[in-house]
């Protein structure tokens, strides 16, 4: 597990504060069962108005539990804070994010509410196309190695802001792969020892080339659609044949929480946050 002990303790402390509109996301959740370590905890909210109140409630809970907290950034729709236990520290970021997603949120006793792994993977495609960060490229390699091919994610990403075409998404990711210096890849924490800058770059370029071939051959009606199997894992359609594939479209509408077998899911109710 990529979380530090401090991050795990913080998440357990704050699990009771998570809800349908305040949930865990970002690189920490994507990599929670993989190798890469993240320096921050991302907590997403559906609206800017919710952010400050959620941050205050979380910080109050952490203070009561004996953690040391300090607000570093306080602006409308965004709060950053450093949290420590005397031996180590991490950053928590609260901010607003579009609630348009392909799956309902998932909730369990340990983590609170979080984005479904498929949505985390689609969001990583969006991040890798929108900014030049070595950790995003490393995460693409990890997604392909541990979870699913990138092609279906690229097609699905067209259904979320900024609604780039799949081809533009591919082009932007490729540009970022080639433009990131080797030392930035080397600075990414927790990666396997054989994940050198050269390895990550070569793997990412191969994966993007494969994804490009897939999107160029995919039926036009899959634009903005996520194709998944019965286990809700994104899949490629072979020769355009849909078979038992499930097609999901991103939506803003609230949905009932699912109960994936890997989670001990609890019901929402008046006694739960």
Question: Where does each model-flagged region fall?
Answer:
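Compositionally biased terminal segments of proteins
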Residues: 1-273
């Amino acid at each position: 597990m990529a979380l530090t002990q401090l991050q795990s303790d913080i998440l357990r402390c704050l699990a009771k504060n998570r809800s349908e509109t305040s949930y865990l996301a970002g690189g920490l959740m994507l990599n929670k069962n993989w190798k890469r370590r993240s320096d921050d905890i991302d907590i997403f909210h559906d609206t800017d108005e919710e952010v400050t109140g959620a941050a205050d409630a979380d910080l109050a809970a952490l203070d009561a539990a004996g953690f040391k907290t300090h607000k570093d950034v306080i602006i409308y729709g965004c709060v950053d804070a450093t949290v420590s236990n005397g031996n180590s520290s991490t950053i928590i970021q609260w901010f607003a994010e579009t609630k348009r997603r392909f799956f309902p949120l998932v909730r369990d006793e340990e983590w609170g509410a979080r984005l479904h792994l498929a949505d985390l993977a689609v969001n990583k495609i969006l991040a890798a196309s929108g900014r030049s960060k070595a950790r995003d490229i490393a995460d693409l390699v990890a997604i392909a190695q541990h979870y699913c091919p990138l092609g279906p994610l690229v097609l699905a990403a067209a259904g979320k802001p900024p609604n780039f075409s799949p081809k533009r998404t591919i082009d932007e990711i490729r540009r970022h792969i080639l433009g990131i210096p080797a030392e930035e890849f080397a600075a990414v924490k927790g990666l396997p020892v054989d994940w050198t800058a050269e390895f990550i770059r070569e793997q990412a370029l191969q994966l993007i080339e494969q994804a490009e071939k897939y999107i160029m051959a995919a039926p036009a009606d899959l634009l903005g659609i996520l194709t998944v199997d019965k286990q809700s894992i994104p899949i490629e359609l072979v020769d355009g044949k849909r078979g038992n594939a499930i097609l999901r479209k991103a939506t803003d509408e609230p949905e009932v929480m699912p109960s994936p077998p890997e989670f001990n899911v609890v019901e929402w109710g008046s006694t739960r946050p």
